[in-house]
Amino acid sequence: MNDSVKTSLKRTLIGRVVSNKMDKTVTVLVEHRVKHPIYGKYVVRSKKYHAHDEANTYNEGDLVEIQETRPVSKTKAWAVARLVEAARVI
């Protein structure tokens, strides 16, 4: 057989943290562009995901990468993998 290193086949998404009010959970807004079938215009579609944040380290406005994982609760089956860009503080 092949003794190569296993790679993760879990889905990853990049989105912005819109809420961190829950304990060990952040709400991540993921946006993607879809071409309208009739008019041809690109429309922004979005979806919110609850992601596991074990240490409560991520704040609103942070750009994070989330990775699919086993279900942690009724609505949470994603975990924050890494911080892509921290929120700008004004």
Curated annotation (Swiss-Prot):
Superkingdom of this protein's organism: Bacteria
MF terms (GO), sorted A to Z: rRNA binding; structural constituent of ribosome
Gene3D superfamilies in alphabetical order: Nucleic acid-binding proteins
Role summary: One of the primary rRNA binding proteins, it binds specifically to the 5'-end of 16S ribosomal RNA.
Subunit annotation: Part of the 30S ribosomal subunit.
Entry similarity comment: Belongs to the universal ribosomal protein uS17 family.
Keywords recorded for this protein, A-Z: Ribonucleoprotein, Ribosomal protein, RNA-binding, rRNA-binding
Keyword Ribonucleoprotein recorded: yes
Organism whose genome encodes this protein: Burkholderia multivorans (strain ATCC 17616 / 249)
Protein name as it appears in the record: Small ribosomal subunit protein uS17
GO-annotated cellular components: cytosolic small ribosomal subunit
SUPFAM superfamilies found in the cross-reference section: Nucleic acid-binding proteins (SSF50249)
Matches recorded under PANTHER family: 40S RIBOSOMAL PROTEIN S11 FAMILY MEMBER (PTHR10744), SMALL RIBOSOMAL SUBUNIT PROTEIN US17M (PTHR10744:SF1)
GO BP terms, alphabetized: translation
Alphabetical list of InterPro entries matching this protein: NA-bd_OB-fold, Ribosomal_uS17, Ribosomal_uS17_bact/chlr, Ribosomal_uS17_CS
